């Protein structure tokens, strides 16, 4: 065989993990007359059964789950799951929900894929630099609402509505993490 090195072992472990089929991997070393034999003990991902979604309001559970087009009754592949996460996040972004993220995705032993979404909820508004009118005159023009997911398209419309009031030379939105 090959000469044993820690770097080689690390490369092997990474290559096996990168296949996406295993959630745990443990090398076992066995002394043989020729040197060391490495036996890899793998723990396969569970067999996929269904997707369970939480934290979503913009897209319903069925719509979110539809992005996870995994084959029921087959072993889940983490690479496929990660591609599904990317497609879902892109769907949110293309609809203006630029702060939405999948914050957790994991497989339960029973084959349930748990997906947690944070849609980037608006926690409130602060009006700064306003001396020409009451703040509520500005905030009533906001298409964004406290407690709803932030939407860049609605934010642009809101800025335009505030600008159209005629009180301000410039209107912009600054996002501050909550």
What spans do the regions from the language model cover?
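Periplasmic polypeptide-binding modules associated with outer-membrane biogenesis and secretion
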Residues: 1-178
């Amino acid at each position: 065989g090959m000469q044993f090195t820690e770097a080689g072992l690390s490369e092997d472990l990474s290559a096996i993990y990168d296949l996406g089929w295993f959630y745990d991997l443990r090398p076992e070393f066995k002394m043989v007359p020729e040197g060391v034999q490495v036996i890899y003990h793998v723990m396969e991902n569970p067999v996929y059964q269904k997707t369970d979604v939480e934290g979503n309001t913009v897209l319903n559970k069925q719509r979110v789950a539809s992005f996870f087009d995994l084959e029921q009754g087959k072993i889940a592949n983490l690479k496929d799951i990660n591609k599904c996460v990317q497609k879902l996040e892109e769907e949110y972004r293309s609809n203006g929900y630029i702060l939405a993220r999948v914050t957790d995705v994991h497989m339960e032993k029973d084959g349930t894929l748990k997906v947690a979404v944070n849609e980037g909820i608006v926690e409130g508004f602060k009006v700064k630099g306003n001396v020409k009118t009451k703040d509520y005159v500005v905030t009533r023009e906001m298409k964004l609402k406290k407690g709803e997911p932030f939407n860049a398209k609605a934010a642009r419309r809101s800025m335009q509505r505030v600008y159209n009031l005629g009180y301000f030379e410039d209107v912009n939105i600054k996002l501050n993490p909550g």
